Every structure is written in structure tokens, then in C-alpha cells.
Amino acid sequence: DGNFSGFSVQPLADMTGKMNLDDAAFFFGNEKNWQTKIGRFEAYDMFPLNQDTFIQYSGNTANDLYADGFGYIYMMKEGRGRSSSGGNLMLSKYAGDVYFELNTLVEDGTSLFQDNSYHGNALDNKKNVAYLRPVIAWKKDAFSIAAAMESNVVNNAYGYRDSQGRFVDQSKRNGYGMTMSWNNSAADPDNGVVANLSTAYLDASGEQDFTAGVNVLWRRFELGYIYAHNNIKEFNTAGIAADIHNPLSEPGNYDIHTVHASYQIPDIMNMKNFNLYLGAYVSLLEANADNKIANGDNDQRYGMRARFKYFF
């Protein structure tokens, strides 16, 4: 009858000898029909970066994504999951070529921010946030397209105290995204192309962000570019040198340009399914010369990574 149930656990050992869990989930459903999944995992990828790609700017999971002064590359990840301070419940359904998904993430909302700081204010967590993240996707042969949104539906979940001691809510976060993909690698493993075009927009408390990215994979080599724009309308500038000629009416405008690349070396030591992935990126944050918030010591970032993978 196609019914199934199961669980998945992905242990993760770090260099200090500690053992953690990357994903841990229980699921059940009906084959190619519907599924319910609960635990720690990632929902539908609305900003795919293609082959095993290394990009580290402010963060790369549901936690520590945002850091004041470093710029924010918004990728529809906030409600996707794999949080260290909460868990997911996801419902999904297939209807022919159409796929529906609703992911719910409940977590400590301040875990999104490094150092629990947002726009120069220390955040006070009042209650857990609950992100709702519906996705609708359509796939036909090599082409697919998906649209989604993610929104925290809990008001006054976290915020800060102003100079009069009043609580100021900062937990408004509404994101929207669309991604299109072409993937004919299954039909043509040697010369197939995997290409992605993605956009995302975030309307948050005192801030709006826009991101667009494109990447292409061909013959084991991947190359991509990401553009991000941040418009921060509110920022606590206490302690920041003031300029009477600039009233800080737009205290944080950033443009971020990122180029990333990846290359796969297959069958290491002639062992089938044992591959090496080499990844690198460079990212440049641009801000106006009179910007008081941009972190000048971190306006350029770059990194490289070598990852070995064995597929069982």
C-alpha cells in the first residue's frame, strides 16, 4: 500500500573530539503521496548553491546567521531548520508534478543573532518563535521552479528595552523567495548541466534585505555569484562617533558581492564513491564611506575547504 515509516540520524564529530548530531528525524507517510517529519533537519532548499560549496559569511544554519556590521546574505534559511535551540515539524504532499510543503520551526529566536545583538541592541528573549514556511514546487523533466515564504507568527518573542525601560519588539521577520533550476545530469552524466537562479527578500524589524544568486555546474566544476543588498533603517548608535553633517538617516546600507567555486575529484585512490570536493569563495562588503556601522575589518572575506565524501 506504499505506507512507510523510519528515522534518520547523522552523527557529526568535530576536531575537539566531541560528538554531535547534524540531523535527527522521525518520519512516516505514503510513498510519492504524503509525509510527516519531525526532529532536527532542513526543509526545502530555496537558495541552492549547487555542488558541495563553501560559503561562510555570518552563519550557515538556522543559528548565528546574523551579525551586526558584517552584512547579511539572506537565503530563506531562517525557518528552514537544523536549529540548535529548537525543532521542526514538516508536512509534505505530492500531486503529480506539484510538491507542497509546510515546515514549522519552533526555537529560541535570539539564536539567529550572533552575540544576541541586533541593530546595536542586546536582545531579551521572552518566548520561543514559531516560523511557518510553506513551499510550492513544480518539476517537469529537467526543469523545476519553487516559491516560498517564511514568517515568525509569534509577536513580542524577543526585543530590547529602550531608555525609558519599555520593551521594543524586534521579532517581526517575513521572508519571500523563488528559485528555478535546470538539471539534466541524470540523463547525461558526462556533459549534463545543473543551473540555479534564486532570489530572496526579507522584511524585518527596522531592516529590508534582498539577495539574488546564480550558479552553474558542468563536468564537476561549479561557479556561482551572489549579490546581496541590506537596508538597515534603525540602529542604536550609542558609543559610535557622531558626525553632525550626517544625521545617520540611513545608518546601514550594504552591498555584498560573493563569488564561489567548487570542483569534484572523483574516485580517490581508485575507490568508487570516494570523492574529494574543493571549494573556495571570496566576498566583498561595500558600504558608503560615512557608514558608522559597517565593520571595516571584515569588509572582505574569503575561504577554502577540502571535503572528503564516501557514498555508501
Where do the protein language model's features map onto the residues?
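Outer membrane beta-barrel
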Residues: 1-107, 128, 137-141
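Residues that define the transmembrane beta-barrel architecture of outer-membrane proteins
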Residues: 18-24, 83-87, 94-96, 128-132, ...
